A protein has these predicted regions:
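A structural boundary/capping signal
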Residues: 1-212
Length: 212
């Protein structure tokens, strides 16, 4: 049987009342990977059966989750880039998000900070420049961590709305500092998101910010 005929046959069985049959159909569809999603979306749009639509939605979600899980594993086994990891978290909530938009927005912020920077600034002055651009010019706000406010944990929504929580604003702050070569690091304190400016001598922090 050709691939297109098999897919059509599988789609015809999506509304099968036998759960065992549907499970086998579902697993076979998932084996096709992400490229089958547009076909599933087209099927959803042209299906009047609500139960079948729910099954299609679940299959699409499982396909996206499977791909995202693989991306997280690759991220963990690679260089574990902070921004890329944050974007993967966003992708769980917004599977169709375009990461390039977030990269472009961060680059705009970085350039605005960079224009105000020079090699003669003290560590405190560097921090003040970053915070002035981030919090005064861009009006970024990081509030209290509220776990049912899911969007506030996603870096893409922070960049779009300029509203997040201590975690997402802290991640954005760290990413900007890394891009600008400013030695700001996260400090491991339980239930807190604290950042510190570390001198080249390493352990002594000359400035910290809770970013709340």
């Amino acid at each position: 049987m050709s691939e297109s005929k098999e897919i059509l046959a599988l789609f015809n069985l999506i509304d099968d009342p036998d759960e065992e049959v549907f499970f086998s159909v579902q697993q076979r569809i998932i084996s096709y990977g992400l490229p089958i999603i547009p076909k599933l979306e087209y099927l959803w749009e042209n299906t009047a059966n609500q139960a079948a639509q729910e099954r299609i939605e679940n299959i699409i979600h499982q396909l996206q989750l499977k791909q995202l899980t693989e991306e997280f594993i690759n991220w963990k086994d690679g260089d574990a880039d902070l921004l890329f990891g944050a974007l993967l978290v966003s992708k769980y909530q917004f599977p169709t998000m375009v990461a390039a938009n977030s990269f472009q927005e961060i680059e705009k912020i970085r350039r605005n900070v960079w224009i105000e920077m020079n090699s003669y600034l003290t560590p405190l002055e560097q921090i003040k420049v970053i915070e002035s651009i981030l919090y005064n010019y861009y009006k970024v706000k990081g509030g209290e961590i509220v776990y049912d406010q899911v969007n506030e944990f996603t870096i893409n929504k922070l960049l779009e709305t300029k509203k997040g929580n201590a975690i997402t604003t802290g991640i954005l702050y760290l990413v900007l500092c890394e891009l600008l070569g400013v030695p700001v690091k996260a400090i491991g304190i339980p239930q807190q998101f604290i950042l510190g400016y570390f001198s080249s001598n390493n352990l002594e922090a000359s400035d910290t910010s809770s970013l709340c």
